[in-house]
Amino acid sequence: MIKLKFLEVKIIITPMGDSMSGIILVRDIMAKNVKTVRTDDSVHDAVVKMNKFDVGSVIVMNSNRPVGIITSKNILTRVVEPRLDAGTIRAKDIMSSPLVSIEPDAPVEEAARIMAQKRIKKLPVMERDKILGILSTSDIVRASPTQLSILQELLRVS
């Protein structure tokens, strides 16, 4: 049982997936084609890349190391709403950091729990400081509808 503010969320797990144990792993459902920007790239460059590849986030890299994430929400709340110039603001200035991530061999249930606790909708998948993929709440719901209740609570409190 996970407590979110004053809510109690039950996690129901049923055997699914191809593995012998029936547990779905993050690596099985993550998106592998992750888009990145550098810390000194402009927010405008990040937006162009997000639009070009139709993604809701980009990972921010510093010397080939993932250091943060920029989501559509970051852009709206930290650039658009205060009416800042996306061409002059740098990725490092609006990214969410430190980066919350998960390992590829973790169960999807663990990913859903982290996302609910941290109130995030995108979770980078990393192994030894290398970005391997990204997991979204949509990926989890598609692969494991039993996780829907925890994600509904996530959306309700955010």
Predicted segments, located by residue:
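N-terminal amphipathic/basic-hydrophobic helices that include classical n-h-c signal peptides
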Residues: M1-S19
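A signal for specific C-terminal beta-sheet/loop modules enriched in small/flexible residues
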Residues: L7, D54, E81-D85
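Residue-level detection of beta-strand scaffold positions
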Residues: V26-I29, S42, A46, I59, ...
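Tandem CBS (Bateman) regulatory domains
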Residues: I13-N33, T71-S101, P107-A116, I134-S158
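A glycine-centered beta-loop-beta connector
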Residues: M50-F53, V58-N74, M115, L123-S138
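Short, mixed-charge, low-aromatic patches
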Residues: I2-F6, A31-K35, V47-K49, R65-S72, ...
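The conserved cystathionine-beta-synthase
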Residues: T36-D54, M61, S101-R119, M126, ...
